[in-house]
Amino acid sequence: MKTETVPPFQETPAGSSCHLNNLLSSRKLMAVGVLLGWLLVIHLLVNVWLLCLLSALLVVLGGWLGSSLAGVASGRLHLERFIPLATCPPCPEAERQLEREINRTIQMIIRDFVLSWYRSVSQEPAFEEEMEAAMKGLVQELRRRMSVMDSHAVAQSVLTLCGCHLQSYIQAKEATAGKNGPVEPSHLWEAYCRATAPHPAVHSPSAEVTYTRGVVNLLLQGLVPKPHLETRTGRHVVVELITCNVILPLISRLSDPDWIHLVLVGIFSKARDPAPCPASAPEQPSVPTSLPLIAEVEQLPEGRASPVAAPVFLSYSEPEGSAGPSPEVEEGHEAVEGDLGGMCEERKVGNNSSHFLQPNVRGPLFLCEDSELESPLSELGKETIMLMTPGSFLSDRIQDALCALESSQALEPKDGEASEGAEAEEGPGTETETGLPVSTLNSCPEIHIDTADKEIEQGDVTASVTALLEGPEKTCPSRPSCLEKDLTNDVSSLDPTLPPVLLSSSPPGPLSSATFSFEPLSSPDGPVIIQNLRITGTITAREHSGTGFHPYTLYTVKYETALDGENSSGLQQLAYHTVNRRYREFLNLQTRLEEKPDLRKFIKNVKGPKKLFPDLPLGNMDSDRVEARKSLLESFLKQLCAIPEIANSEEVQEFLALNTDARIAFVKKPFMVSRIDKMVVSAIVDTLKTAFPRSEPQSPTEELSEAETESKPQTEGKKASKSRLRFSSSKISPALSVTEAQDKILYCLQEGNVESETLSMSAMESFIEKQTKLLEMQPTKAPEKDPEQPPKGRVDSCVSDAAVPAQDPSNSDPGTETELADTALDLLLLLLTEQWKWLCTENMQKFLRLIFGTLVQRWLEVQVANLTSPQRWVQYLLLLQESIWPGGVLPKFPRPVRTQEQKLAAEKQALQSLMGVLPDLVVEILGVNKCRLSWGLVLESLQQPLINRHLIYCLGDIILEFLDLSASVEESAATTSASDTPGNSKRMGVSS
C-alpha cells in the first residue's frame, strides 16, 4: 500500500491489521451464508415450514440489502427508482402549434389594440410589419430567457410564497374569529397585514400605478429588441399605454376570485393531460382544444358584423376518443382566421382610396415650408414649438394660383437674390382621376411683406386666379394633402369645385422661368451636389435648464441640391433646403468627422469652429460677435461641402438634414431610432400640423419679448412689433424685426439684459471647479435610477418584504437533493395541521422525508416539466385568447355579469379540480373528506381581491428575478449615463 495514497491514521501496523481482520471476517460470513443457503435448499425438499421461514428471511435480507442499494449516505430511500414517473414526450407538432398560437395572438393584438388607433393618424402599411416583427422579437427573447430559467428554483420560490400566504391567512383568520357575525374584508385585510408585510404596490392606488409603470419599463428595456423604444418619448408613451390599458386591468382580472376559480379549473382539470402525438397524423393537435373553461359569449347585437353567429360553450372535459378539435372551437378558429385574412388583404390592397392626413411617401430631397425640417432647441430636442413662414401671410389658395403663371409668363426677379431662402418639396406620388401620376415639386422663395402692401399684393394674386379660371385647359397637378389649408376671406367666394393646385409662393415681382424648373427630379435618390450654401441669418431663442431660461443663437443654414449627373439638361433642376443649427451642433459635426479615420485626412486643412469652453453658459453674445461667428461657420460648411467625400458622408448629410428630420438634434454620438418610433412621431406630428395649420405657436421668446417691451421706451416697443415673420416648420418662434428686403437677410435680435446672463470671472472659476469635481466623482458614481423602476431589493428577494418565508432556500444546503420536496412537504403539513395533528409531529416529519422525500421531489419535477411543456403553453394561450377574444373577436360590449349561482358552481368545480392534484392513492390514505377540507382552506384564502392582488405582485417579483433583466437594464443605464456626461447641456444649462 502506497504511503502517499493512504491517510496518516492508516499508516501504522495496527491500522493495517484491523483492515485485514475485517476483510477476513466478511469472507467468513459470506462462506457461512452460502453454507446455510445450501442447507436450507436441501431442507426445502423435506418440510414446507422451512419454505415459509426461508421466504421471511429473504424478505428481511432484501430489505437490508435493498436499503443499502437504494439509499445514499444520508439514509434516504430512493423509491422513485421503482415507481416510473414520465414527463410529456417532446412533440414537434406541439412546437408548431405553439408558434401558430403565438403568431395568432400577436396579430390579434396588433389588429385590435394597435391599428385601431394608429389608422386614425396614419395609413402607413409598413408600421404593421415593423410592429409585428418587434413583438415577435420580444416573444423570442422572453422564450429564450424562460428556457434558461431555473424552473426548480422558481417552483420552490412559488411554493414558499404559497406557504407564507397560507400561514398568514390562518393567523389572520384566527385573529378575526372572535368577532360576532361575518368578518368584513377590510378587517381581514388588516389582520393579514399584521401577520405579514404587504407588498408596496398595494399601499395606495398611486403606489400601484407607479410600481406597475416601473415593472413595465423594466420589461420593455430587457425584452424589446434594439433599437425599438430607445427614444425617451416613445418609451414613455408605450409604457403608459401598456400600464393603464393592459397591466392594471389584467391585475384586476387576475385578482377576481371567480376568475381564479375558472383558471384553476382550466389548469388542474382531469382532462388536462394531452393526448400523445400520433405519428401517422401530424396534422392533429397534440393537446385537446376543447378548453376546460366555461365561457359564455354574449349574444351580439343584430347590427354587428361578426363571423360568430352563436355563443361558444367550452366543456370542462374532453370526450373520450376525440382527438380533433371540437366544432365550437373550430368555429372560433375560423372566425379568427377570417378576420386575420381580411386584415392581410387590407395590407395587400393598400389604402390608396382613403384620405390621408399626410402623404405616405415624402421625398427627403425636396422640402417646402409646411414640412420644413426643424432645428431642435437642444441636443435632445426637448421642446417642439411651431412657427409660420413669411409666406403664410397669404392665403394658400391664392399662392396656389401662381403655379398657372409659371409656364406662360416670364417674370424678372425683383433683386439679385430673389431666390434667397427658396425651398421646394416633392410630395407623394399620388394619381389623379385619370390615373396619371401627379408631380408636386414646388419652388417656394420667401416673401417679405409690409402690412401696407399686403392688400395690393392679394389683389394682384386674385387677378391671377381669375386668369387661371379663364384657361381651363391649363391645369396644375394636385397639391399634397399636407398643404391643404382653409381659405381666407379674400377667396371665400371662389368656386368650391376648384381643384387644388400646386403651391408656389413668389415675391411680388417678375421671376425668370429659365432659372428654376418646377418638375420633379428624375432620380431624387441618386447622388446630389450641395451648392450655394450660406448662413442667411440668426435666430435667438431660449431653452429651459435647471437654473431657468437661457438664450442661445440658432444659425439658419440654407443650401441648394442638384442631381450629380452628366446628362443633365441645360435647365439646372434645384431643390432648396433650410435647417437651423446652434453652435454646439457645429462642434459636434467637427468632432464626428475627426473621429472617423477615413474622413479625418480630408479635414486637416479645414478651419473649424473653436472648442474653447463651448458648453459654458456664458449667455448670448452681441450682434458683432454673432456675425463674426456666423461668417466663420459659413466658411467652415462651404469648405466641407467642397470636398466630395465629406459632402457625401453620413455626418454632413445628417447635419444638413438632407435625408433626416432636422427636429432631431445633431449630437456627438449618433443613436439608432427604430422605424416604429419614426413612423409614430411622423404620423402624430403630421396630424397636428393638419389639424392646427394656423394655430398661434407658444413661443418661449414671446415672454422675453414682452418683458423687453415693458422695460423699453414706448417708441422702441412699437418699433419692435412693427413686422413679425413666423416660420411654421421651425421649433423656435422668435419675433423677427424686418424693416426692408435685403439681398442677404439677417435675423438677429439684440437681447436686453444680456450682461446679466453672462458669468463673471469669479463665477466662471467656480463653475470650472464644480465641473472638475463632477468629473472626478463620475467613475465612482452609481448610475441614476429610474424613480419608477421597482426596487431592486424587491425584485431580487422575491418575497423578502411581502412574506417571511417559513424556510429560507438560501439557508439550506445547495447540495441537498430534496429542497423542492421539503418545501412542498412543509406546505402540505401546514394544510394537514388541523385534520391530522399526529401526522405533523417532528418524528413523523423526519420519517416522511426519509421515506418519501426523493419520490415527492421527482413527482414535483415531473409536474413542473408538464406544466411548462409546449402542450400546456398552447393551452394557456387558448385560455388567454378565449378570455380576451371570445369566438376570435374582441367584444364591443362588456360581458354580462356572472350570476352568484355561476360563481358558486365555478368554485365547486375548482375544488374538485384541486382534489385531482394529489395522486388518488394519497387521497385514499389521507381521506377524501379531510383532503376536501384542506383544499377548501386554500380556496377560502383566495376570496379576497386585495389579498390576491398582493399575491400577484409578489409572484411578479419572483418572475422578474428569474428572468434576469438586470444585465439589460444596467447596459441601458450605462448608455444613458454615458450620454448624460457632466458637460452635457441638459444638466448644465448650456446656451451656446
Curated annotation (Swiss-Prot):
Binding-site list for a 1,2-diacyl-sn-glycero-3-phospho-(1D-myo-inositol-3-phosphate): 582, 629
Biased composition (Basic and acidic residues): 709-719, 782-795
SMART domains named in the record: PX (SM00312), PXA (SM00313)
Keywords: Cytoplasmic vesicle, Endosome, Exocytosis, Lipid-binding, Membrane, Protein transport, Transport
GO molecular function, one term: phosphatidylinositol binding
Positions with biased composition (Polar residues): 980-992
PANTHER family named in the record: SORTING NEXIN, SORTING NEXIN-19
Protein name stated in the entry: Sorting nexin-19
Organism this protein belongs to: Homo sapiens
Gene: SNX19
